[in-house]
From Swiss-Prot:
The keyword Protein biosynthesis applies. GO terms for biological process: translation. This is Glutamyl-tRNA(Gln) amidotransferase subunit A. One of its GO terms (cellular component) is glutamyl-tRNA(Gln) amidotransferase complex. SUPFAM superfamilies: Amidase signature (AS) enzymes. Its EC number is 6.3.5.7. Pfam families: Amidase (PF01425). Heterotrimer of A, B and C subunits. Allows the formation of correctly charged Gln-tRNA(Gln) through the transamidation of misacylated Glu-tRNA(Gln) in organisms which lack glutaminyl-tRNA synthetase. The reaction takes place in the presence of glutamine and ATP through an activated gamma-phospho-Glu-tRNA(Gln).
Length: 485
């Protein structure tokens, strides 16, 4: 039995009783990484020497101090678009292959203050643009449940590492589903918090009005502990919200008696596989048995979400990625004769095809003559999508549906058709456009592959999402299933 089969509260208790040490936890993590990561390829960079040194320091602290936080000594993996001082951060892009940050992201600072131990940086789609982690500039991460299938994306490395038992926790980022979709594919728990709940300072920007950092874990309880630590106002991020952070773990009462659930007909309609639809209906029966009620509703503007998202996200990306020019950091071409040629060649050689595709789309949408027809119209539709959610939440506590239309697809199956790949996020994108929180939890299996249940809540009401997710988790055993590697 692995130490990471225990919940974090159980590991904390074992540390408190001196039955295990922090070094034991860190050793367990690296042992597992060395055993299975050659197959899974979740990690881009390991932090082994520094992690072991920190473990020794924390063991000394453990010997003298009686009180310490729940994340004390816990190994964690960080998605490679979150900057870590002195630890290479590449965004899985060749243009940043040698970037060594000089500061920590706010979430990393908060983890360090909580005495968590960073064991390494995790693979992703380049600059978080993708749904399969096939767009990484360095390696192909595989799904631990079936090594011939994708782990999802863009936080595929984070979800795969947790599912494979390499770390008990990981951080990901979610712009259009990039935490929830890989969590669903890998059979783990992934939360996209409300926009503004978690600081984005130190998150390399893709689409600034959509990006949000969040936790990926094996259980809902562990997820709540991690969100507790990373949440809260940050003066370094002007979009960080000055909203009190509740005690998320206290919300895990298991009581959902009288809870009102909305199920959008658009989320169980065309494009969603029959097996996934049935898994969601079965999950709703479980929640009914626990005292909740559900009704079908409509989110009428959901059909425009995909087009709206790709116009807005690509427009923001075209501006955000202009900073990668070969002058200040990262890759610089050797084949340029003058400054302008250096800019062009550096970006052409450094960025992958999907990143270049989205930069071009965004530049087009923002260009003179097209701004009103595309970007401005997309912003108006985004407002309508947000209003759809607000209307439903006037009557219901949460919205529930599948996280993805299908389970994990095969590697290479969708790479030649970008539109088919984009459609994989059709159920997660509206949540980002509305800025509300959403979680994916395991709710079944189809042919041995995990299926994710998405629970969506009101602005800054992650507590209710956690309460529902935890109640379902306690009534089922899907979260206890593990892949065989």
């Amino acid at each position: 039995m692995s130490l990471f089969d225990y919940r974090v509260s159980e590991l904390h208790s074992l540390l408190h009783k001196k039955e295990i040490s922090v070094s034991d936890l860190v050793d367990e993590s690296f042992k597992r990484i060395h055993e299975v990561d050659e197959k899974v390829q979740a990690f881009l960079t390991l932090n082994e020497e520094q992690a072991r040194a920190k473990a020794k320091e924390l063991d000394e602290k453990l010997a003298t101090e009686k009180e310490f936080g729940l994340l004390f000594g816990m190994p964690i993996g960080i998605k490679d678009n979150i900057v870590t001082k002195g630890l290479r951060t590449t965004c899985a892009s060749k243009i940043l292959y040698n970037f060594d940050p000089i500061y920590d992201a706010t979430v990393v600072e908060r983890l360090n203050e909580a005495d968590a131990v960073t064991v390494g940086k995790l693979n992703m789609d380049e600059f978080a643009m993708g749904s399969s982690t096939e767009n990484s500039g360095f390696q192909l991460t595989r799904n631990p449940w079936d090594l011939e299938r994708v782990p999802g994306g863009s936080s595929g490395g984070s979800a795969a590492a947790v599912a494979a038992g390499e770390v008990p926790f990981a951080l990901g980022s979610d712009t259009g589903g990039s935490i929830r979709q890989p969590a669903a594919f890998c059979g783990v728990v992934g939360l996209k918090p409300t926009y503004g709940r978690v600081s984005r300072y130190g998150l390399v920007a893709f689409a600034s009005s959509l990006d949000q950092i969040g936790p990926i874990t094996r259980t809902v309880e562990d997820n709540a502990y991690l969100l507790q630590v990373i949440s809260g106002l940050d003066p370094m991020d002007s979009t960080s919200a000055n909203v009190d952070v509740p005690d998320y773990v206290s919300a895990l009462t298991g009581d959902i008696q009288g809870l009102k659930i909305a199920v959008p007909k658009e989320y169980l309609g065309e494009g969603v596989s029959e097996e996934v639809r049935q898994s969601v209906l079965d999950a709703l029966k479980v929640l009914e048995g626990l005292g909740a009620t559900w009704e079908e509703v409509s989110l009428p503007h959901s059909k425009y979400a995909l087009a709206t998202y790709y116009l807005l996200a690509s427009s923001e990306a075209s501006a955000n990625l202009a900073r990668f020019d070969g002058v200040r950091y990262g890759y610089r071409t050797d084949h340029a004769k003058n400054l302008m040629e250096m800019y062009k060649q550096t970006r052409s050689e450094g960025f992958g095809n999907e990143v270049k595709r989205r930069i071009m789309l965004g530049t087009f949408a923002l260009s003179s003559g097209y701004y009103d027809a595309y970007y401005k119209k997309a912003q108006k539709v985004r407002t309508l999508i947000k209003q759809d959610f607000e209307n439903v939440f006037e009557k219901y506590d949460v919205i529930i549906g599948p996280t993805t239309p299908t389970p994990a697809f095969k590697i290479g199956e969708k790479t030649s058709d970008p539109l088919t790949m984009y459609a994989n996020d059709i159920l997660t994108i509206p949540v980002n456009l509305a800025g509300v929180p959403g979680i994916s939890i395991p709710c079944g299996f189809v042919n041995g592959l995990p299926v994710g249940l998405q629970i969506i809540g009101k602005h800054f009401d992650e507590s209710t999402i956690y309460r529902v997710a935890h109640a379902f988790e306690q009534a089922t055993d899907y979260h206890k299933q593990k892949p065989t590697l």
